[in-house]
Amino acid sequence: MQLIKNNFSRYVIAIIACLTSACSPIKVLNSLVPENGYELVSAVEYGANARQKLDIYLPKATEKSTALKKVIIFYYGGNWDSGERADYKFAAEALVGHGYIVVIPDYRVYPEVLFPGFMADPVSVAKWVKTNIKKYNGDANGVFLAGHSAGAHIAVMMAINPEYLAEASLKPNDFAGVIGLAGPYDFLPLKSDRLKVIFGSDAEQWKSQPINFVDGKNPPLLLAVGMKDGTVWPRNSINLAKKIKDNNGLVEVAEFANYGHIDMVTKLAKPLRGDGELLKAITLFINSH
């Protein structure tokens, strides 16, 4: 009972502090997330650009172990035009608590880059992790690509269209698996003028759709979808999964009946986790590959 009271008091104090200083909702959420379960290696450069930095969340060792840890690279969403790695501390905390190393990078977005240019930085991150993660006791053969929304599009595109990873002398099956949360994979025709600028002419837009590159040779794929998502329609995940299955590829679908678009990432946060069904689906997938 005392623990519950202490946690409640901490949440109330954090909310009041953020409200009185005009914090963003994401900062409020992150202020409620525990920080004592991991070590943070911040602002590691993987390139020369100001946005080519990544954070590494390492599980705190409870006992000496030489076993290498599985690694998750998490690409955040933001409509391909925004996002900050520090905002996703809550997601890292959820995953690092299960013993995984979590890498969250920034990457260049619109208007600095357009499609397919915005794929370059995520590929560079994947290469950096494969090359360097053993220094942090990470398993280079146990690296998972993951993302939410636009970040899921990027992660899944790397898994399905091998031309992107080939630029870094990598192949999709160099990765243990891929996790897409509420991702857009089959979203033509484009209606937004901004997206038409990002993804180019009508004749070229087909190249931006992961579903168009399915050949069944992808690494194991988990597509998690909120069935109340009104931002990225659930059909994106359902259609992609069907095509992968039709090509004898490896794919699992986790449907969440009452989740909307934002729920598909914020439900990882400890204060909003509820029964933890989203986190359970992710950890079950990772632990089985």
Model-derived regions: residue spans:
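Short beta-strand/loop motif that positions the catalytic acidic residue
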Residues: 223-225, 229
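N-terminal cap/lid segment of alpha/beta-hydrolase-fold proteins
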Residues: 26-65
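Alpha/beta-hydrolase active-site loop
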Residues: 113-134
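Short beta-strand element of the alpha/beta-hydrolase
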Residues: 67-78
